[in-house]
Amino acid sequence: MAGGGGKSVAAALAMACFLLILAAFAPPAAAAPPDIMSIIRYNAEHGVRGLERTEAEARAAYDLWLARHRRGGGGGSRNGFIGEHERRFRVFWDNLKFVDAHNARADERGGFRLGMNRFADLTNGEFRATYLGTTPAGRGRRVGEAYRHDGVEALPDSVDWRDKGAVVAPVKNQGQCGSCWAFSAVAAVEGINKIVTGELVSLSEQELVECARNGQNSGCNGGIMDDAFAFIARNGGLDTEEDYPYTAMDGKCNLAKRSRKVVSIDGFEDVPENDELSLQKAVAHQPVSVAIDAGGREFQLYDSGVFTGRCGTNLDHGVVAVGYGTDAATGAAYWTVRNSWGPDWGENGYIRMERNVTARTGKCGIAMMASYPIKKGPNPKPSPPSPAPSPPQQCDRYSKCPAGTTCCCNYGIRNHCIVWGCCPVEGATCCKDHSTCCPKEYPVCNAKARTCSKSKNSPYNIRTPAAMARSVPEQPDSISFVVLNREDLV
């Protein structure tokens, strides 16, 4: 992106993101006891009076946690190795002590709370090494002036785009794929589309994963939201999630679905960096894609409240700011941030992050690399339905060739064809050697010279005939065939 009025970002984001492998192993809701959270969350009997859970209590909590987060319950292990179950329990117990101690302090002083979520049997080092990405060299940004805060205009005290129906519910889950950048961009586009057109349409993250390989985007191996917006604008729109569903893995771009442009944008701009007031102004008008440092232990185990925990500015995760406000109980200003780890992380898939901090970068770097899609007009008209496929070519009563090919006789007696072949082009001329054919644009076939030409004496625009494949008999057990590629016509 070309620069636009501000200094270049020191480090652009290449989100390898959180690959939520554990999401695939969640059991049905009935598998978890109804009182599980009363056991695995902080209990006033522990921590406040300096007591620690006994090993038996910790194992009971771990068994309940396994029933909720791992298929197979207490006898299972993350990787199936001998001794891994015990090792995972020890990590879980250490995290449980950390959560108990933190929540005891939170109860005394007020503050955000932690919980034993799906990451509770990972050390923070494992969490960071397995699920977090890197930060490559930066590049220019397309900084817009529309939301630059001049310190004069009044902004609403609070905004929540969920209340205005501009976010898809429930929170989506990126699963075991580093596609947070795609989820962030899609959520921002879904929001602006609702604001402009009045329609809330769930859009396809998978199209971005498979088709948006521009810039720094690399499917499940990470990407950045600006490049996702650039792809959507250049492509003329994005397909729906229903038509192009998410698979949590890389794949080949489906060109037919890529051409179904249901929701479009006109472009994108970047919020002036390191300026929370400009970010606030932007979020007051629409959901905004932001990048954050999500690698801290407290972030890993976040459960509820306004997050004021330790974090840096190593931008490694893409999320969406969908609002801001002030906590009624504590008076803490916060950002409402939509994650892509499903609805069972944090506050139904959201985290409230501290706002108006001393650092210009914002909490966890939230003000460093924010961007938003631009949309001014209606969406593209629905594409006409694809034409029905042509029927197979019937050569005779017993043989046929696929649609888009031509029946040519391979072997015959007098005027009766015994064996049919299929020329790999439609409307072709069958050559007299009974084994090759010429396209209709070059109908003159010289089998001996192996040429196709436009006229009998033309020395120009000569092509080589294509070889034919055997036709399909009506009795499929007798003969099989493969149609040769059009590349035979060179």
Swiss-Prot record:
Q: Which region is the signal sequence?
A: 1-31
Q: Which residues are glycosylated?
A: N356
Knockout-associated phenotype: Plants show overall delay of growth and development, and mature plants are dwarf. Panicle of CP1 mutant contains several flowers which remain unfertilized due to the abnormal development of the pollen.
Q: Name one GO cellular component term.
A: lysosome
Query: Tissue expression, per UniProt?
Result: Highly expressed in the tapetum and developing pollen of the anther locules. Weakly expressed in root and germinating seed, hardly in the anther-less-flower and not detected in leaf.
Q: Which UniProt keywords apply?
A: Developmental protein, Differentiation, Disulfide bond, Flowering, Glycoprotein, Hydrolase, Protease, Signal, Thiol protease, Zymogen
The yes or no answer to whether the keyword Signal is present is: yes
The domain of life is Eukaryota
Per its record, what are the GO molecular function terms?
cysteine-type endopeptidase activity
UniProt-recorded name of the protein:
Cysteine protease 1
Q: Which gene encodes it?
A: CP1
